[in-house]
Amino acid sequence: DDLPDSIDWRENGAVVPVKNQGGCGSCWAFSTVAAVEGINQIVTGDLISLSEQQLVDCTTANHGCRGGWMNPAFQFIVNNGGINSEETYPYRGQDGICNSTVNAPVVSIDSYENVPSHNEQSLQKAVANQPVSVTMDAAGRDFQLYRSGIFTGSCNISANHALTVVGYGTENDKDFWIVKNSWGKNWGESGYIRAERNIENPDGKCGITRFASYPVKKGTN
């Protein structure tokens, strides 16, 4: 496949500033929203910060601040006819009752797709088109204390944290993923981690290839 050697969706205007999930286990909502914000900008040209809190409160297939997955959240957005802006359903960082009275979707998606797992080339192909939701093992000390550079620290592959891959590249012959986290701008490289890419394990760094998925958007909102 003829894929670009590198891509950074931040430079293409498809990524809103890094957010902070706080003490709520809502990483799945942030991962989902970042992917939807991305494809919406790519398709429509508009970059709109969208509502994680709506997903936390309203995605009944997930568990709010106690965890969840991206695919049921994508499916909620499909079924709901879209997702609210951050402005109209702001983040509170705690579980809440779904507020249907403020339901005013501004961005819709058509469906979602899973990236073929255990294959970094499949993930690269997807990320060449748009930001992609992924899981990583973020429980280890090395990950949590990451500051900068290409992350080569130790981690396993358990899917305990959700993030969004917003690009990839190579530095000094070392390939990396550009991954957006939701732990605020003071963590890592201004809220991002560059994780080593094209490693020998098909699960990818910290299991990044295991549960990757992305929203499909065909037209306007």
Swiss-Prot record:
GO biological process, one term: proteolysis
SUPFAM superfamilies xref list: Cysteine proteinases
Enzyme class: hydrolase
Coiled-coil ranges from the UniProt annotation: none
UniProt record similarity statement: Belongs to the peptidase C1 family.
EC number: 3.4.22.67
Catalyzed reaction equations: Preferential cleavage of peptides with a proline residue at the P2 position
InterPro entries for the chain: Papain-like_cys_pep_sf (IPR038765), Pept_cys_AS (IPR000169), Pept_his_AS (IPR025660), Peptidase_C1A (IPR013128), Peptidase_C1A_C (IPR000668), Peptidase_C1A_papain-like (IPR039417)
Name of this protein: Zingipain-2
Keywords: Disulfide bond, Glycoprotein, Hydrolase, Protease, Thiol protease
Catalytic residues identified in the record: 27, 161
The protein's role, per its UniProt record: Cysteine proteinase with a specific activity toward peptides with a proline residue at the P2 position.
Cysteines joined through disulfide linkages: 24-65, 58-98, 155-206
Residues carrying covalently attached carbohydrate according to the record: 99, 156
Record GO terms (molecular function): cysteine-type peptidase activity
